[in-house]
């Protein structure tokens, strides 16, 4: 509360009101008008840490307003592909917690603070109850935030603000096919007019699903209190709590091209057989008809024929379940020292408790984890005079008279001055993560989904013995996991190989940063940022074999983030920019913790995941900002994490174009297009099997067994799971008498399911439409999602394409009633 004390001491001071082009904006946070979708109508201070218009931000950025979130029906991390370029997201493990940007898991921020708690997009689903708008920024996070391994981009969730003018309330209820039931209550207003205001939002869901045995039950509460005791100080306290019980949906297994094209599914059960046909036991089966170096607990499938599968029949046992509880709290203080100086302090607490449990013995547990962070920023905005007309010839003039002569006819200061926007600060983050997973025993292809779903199960005995066994998680009944460390006997026998996910870690991150935007002229500006982090980590293995001490490891590492940018206003309506960004980051374990290498140490290469980004673009603002167009092209080097395998370097090229047009309050249109070329050049990626056919005995397959992780030969591989091209469009029109229509389209180019492209999802499209009527304080709305009932598919995981594929939702009708008071 240092800023509060400073504000108290300055309470009797009067803040200067002299004009200046670089003066700071008032502390009051201004939002967009309710139906405005134009990025040009507000600043994006949380994108780069400075109060900049979207045309001045040297990066590709999308601003998704409340109006767009509602009309495009944004409910999950995947739905951003409906409204923004380069945001196609796989169904990672059936319920992604993070959006993908430019083909990689994106960072998620909460009012400019990294939430964390995710690895490869696995974690608690995004809770939109607290969200007012979303900034989607392409490329690594800037110096003020520090980069992570997720350098494709980040989304920043901007929370709801209190109502300071009068009391407002809103009740929403949505009902839809497949037993969908969602509801929200939102209210707030001033407590002390002009001084103290609040807002509270509650949302809940009690929904079934189109998919067999899948459901969602959630409760969320958000509250914010804003106190403005003086004109130069503001305190905002907020808390977002969410609890969700849901089902992990991993899609359909045995993804052949015939399944994708025609819905044809190969039937048959896992059989433990050898070449003579003699049955054998499950613990060390000689089930592979082709020799392998991994005689693990796996089997082969004896095909019995083919059938047209019901797309609702997914890999879910009725006894499977998932759970997540999150709590994010912030205290945001703003102290205006003068027109040109402001202190901003953001204190954050994050809590996560989650688990995912499948009867096929995929499990993930985070129990619990929490983060404490405090970031202090000093913003200094000044005009530095370089030259101006001499007034020495007028010595008899007073100071005020000289000031008048020092202005031109427009009121602007004559001469040349350099504008400077400076942000410097300190950041401390403490993180505690306890996380255990078992990713070694997921035998997806061995289950026949046309049979009783209760048979989707792996016996506990089969994961407790054999190679790389699982162990009971201490203090958590019914959960088993494999170690994060590697355990070898004195004779050299490997008992366990570290899974790269399980970790019990304590981490402290100390950082300092500086950002400086120098406006050399009204047209030309340079922007520099640098941040240095000192990261200390203590690791202990949460599970380990009997007779062994748990593996421990410690490290202290330095990380750096540097970026340089230039913007040039070609015309009043056109701005060009170029950016270069270099960063190093750590390799994350599950739950946002840190994993160790196969040598049971923190390997230096795991803290040298380098990223280089070169990006250039043009931004246009026509008709007083009512038409906004942005284009960008980029080249980036980065690292791609693999499940249970080393990260891989990747080079990507791409381009994006976005258009926002809103000529009046009745109509708006958004369009976006992106092209991405993510290539792993001369790399040897790992994959669950060489082909889906490895699971089947000849003549249908090779009979090598499943799972049977292979390392592919070195070569050039297109990253699977991501379309090279994505296009979306959204149109909305409302008549003056209240009737309105909305339309949305999303088109994806072919998507490889595997690295070799043996199975390909073809070009697909999804069309959504809605009709609504607004009368006074009531809105009635009907949405038809996928109204052409396309039988679309999506990737579940970038390296599990031989095991599973996700059937997208069919046509669905939803009805919403919204009442405001």
Residue ranges: model-predicted function:
Residues 409, 626, 632-637, 647-756, ...:
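Gram-negative outer-membrane beta-barrel transporters
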Residues 678, 748-754, 773-821:
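C-terminal beta-signal and adjacent terminal beta-strands/loops
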Residues 25-166, 616:
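Acidic, small-polar-rich N-terminal luminal/periplasmic segments of exported/outer-membrane proteins
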Residues 129-132, 144-222, 229-235, 327, ...:
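Outer-membrane beta-barrel translocator/receptor signature
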């Amino acid at each position: 509360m240092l800023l509060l004390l400073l504000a108290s001491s300055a309470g009797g001071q009067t803040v200067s009101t002299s004009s200046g082009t670089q003066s700071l904006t008032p502390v009051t946070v201004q939002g967009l008008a309710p139906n405005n979708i134009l990025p040009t109508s507000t600043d994006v201070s949380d994108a780069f840490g400075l109060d900049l218009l979207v045309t001045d931000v040297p990066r590709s950025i999308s601003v998704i307003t409340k109006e767009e979130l509602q009309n495009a029906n944004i409910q999950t991390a995947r739905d951003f592909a409906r409204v923004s370029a380069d945001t196609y997201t796989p169904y990672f493990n059936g319920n992604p917690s993070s959006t993908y940007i430019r083909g990689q898991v994106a960072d998620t921020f909460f009012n400019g603070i990294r939430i964390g708690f995710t690895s490869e997009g696995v974690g608690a689903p995004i809770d939109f109850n607290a969200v007012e708008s979303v900034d989607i920024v392409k490329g690594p996070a800037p110096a003020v935030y520090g980069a992570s391994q997720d350098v494709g981009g980040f989304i920043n969730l901007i929370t709801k603000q209190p109502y300071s003018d009068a009391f407002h309330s809103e009740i929403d209820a949505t009902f839809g096919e497949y037993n969908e039931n969602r509801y929200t209550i939102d209210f707030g207003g001033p407590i002390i007019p002009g001084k103290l205001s609040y807002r509270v939002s509650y949302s809940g869901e009690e929904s079934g699903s189109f998919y067999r045995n899948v459901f969602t039950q959630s409760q969320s509460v958000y509250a914010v209190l804003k106190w403005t005791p003086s004109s130069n100080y503001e305190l905002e306290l907020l808390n977002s709590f969410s609890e969700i019980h849901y089902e992990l949906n991993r899609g359909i297994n045995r993804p052949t091209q015939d399944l994708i094209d025609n819905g044809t599914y190969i039937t048959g059960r896992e059989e433990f057989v050898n070449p003579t046909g003699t049955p054998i036991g499950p613990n060390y089966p000689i089930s592979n008809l082709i020799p392998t170096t991994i005689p693990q607990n796996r089997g082969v499938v004896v095909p019995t024929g083919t059938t047209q599968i019901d797309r609702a029949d997914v890999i879910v046992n009725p006894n499977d379940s998932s759970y997540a509880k999150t709590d994010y709290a912030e205290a945001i203080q703003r102290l205006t020292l003068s027109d040109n100086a402001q202190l901003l302090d953001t204190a954050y607490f994050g809590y996560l408790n989650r688990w995912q449990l499948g009867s096929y013995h995929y499990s993930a547990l985070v129990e619990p984890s929490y983060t404490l962070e405090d970031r202090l920023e000093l913003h200094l905005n000044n005009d530095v005079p370089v030259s101006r007309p001499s007034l020495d010839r007028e010595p008899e003039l007073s100071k005020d008279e000289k000031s008048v002569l020092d202005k031109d006819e427009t009121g602007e200061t004559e001469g040349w001055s350099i504008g400077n926007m400076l942000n410097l600060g300190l950041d401390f983050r403490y993180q505690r993560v306890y996380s255990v997973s078992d990713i070694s025993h997921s035998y997806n292809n061995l289950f026949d989904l046309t049979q009783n779903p209760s048979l989707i199960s792996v016996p506990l005995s089969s994961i407790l013995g054999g190679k790389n066994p699982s162990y009971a998680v201490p203090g958590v009944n019914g959960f088993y996991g494999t170690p994060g460390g590697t355990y070898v006997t004195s004779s050299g026998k490997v008992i366990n190989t570290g899974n790269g996910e399980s970790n019990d870690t304590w981490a402290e991150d100390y950082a300092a940063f500086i950002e400086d935007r120098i406006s050399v002229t009204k047209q030309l500006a340079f922007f520099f940022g640098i941040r240095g982090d000192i990261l200390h980590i203590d690791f202990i293995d949460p599970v380990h074999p009997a007779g062994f001490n748990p593996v421990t490891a410690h490290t202290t590492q330095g990380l750096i983030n540097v970026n340089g940018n230039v913007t040039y206003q070609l015309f009043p309506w056109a701005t060009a920019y170029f950016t270069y960004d270099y960063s190093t980051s750590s390799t994350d374990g599950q739950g946002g913790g840190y994993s160790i290498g196969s040598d049971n140490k923190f390997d230096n290469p795991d803290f040298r995941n380098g990223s280089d980004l070169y990006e250039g673009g043009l931004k246009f603002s026509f008709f007083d900002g009512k038409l906004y167009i942005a284009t960008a092209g980029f080249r980036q080097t980065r690292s791609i994490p693999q499940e249970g395998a080393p990260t891989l370097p990747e080079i990507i090229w791409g381009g994006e174009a976005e258009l926002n047009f809103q000529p009046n309050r009745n109509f708006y249109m958004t369009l976006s297009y992106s092209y991405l070329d993510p290539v792993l050049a001369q790399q040897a990626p790992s994959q669950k099997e060489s082909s889906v056919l490895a699971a089947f005995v000849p003549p249908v397959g090779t009979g090598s067994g499943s799972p049977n992780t292979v390392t592919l030969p070195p070569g050039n591989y297109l990253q699977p799971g991501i379309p090279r091209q994505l296009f979306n469009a959204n149109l909305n029109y409302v008549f003056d008498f209240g009737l309105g229509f909305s339309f949305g389209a999303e088109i994806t180019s072919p998507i490889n399911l595997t690295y070799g492209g043996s199975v390909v999802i073809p070009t697909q499209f999804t069309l959504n439409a809605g009709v609504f009527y607004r009368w006074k304080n009531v809105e009635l709305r009907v949405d038809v999602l996928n109204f052409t009932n396309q039988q679309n598919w999506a990737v579940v995981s970038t390296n599990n394409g031989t095991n599973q594929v996700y059937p997208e939702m069919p046509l669905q009708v939803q009805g919403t009633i919204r009442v405001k008071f």
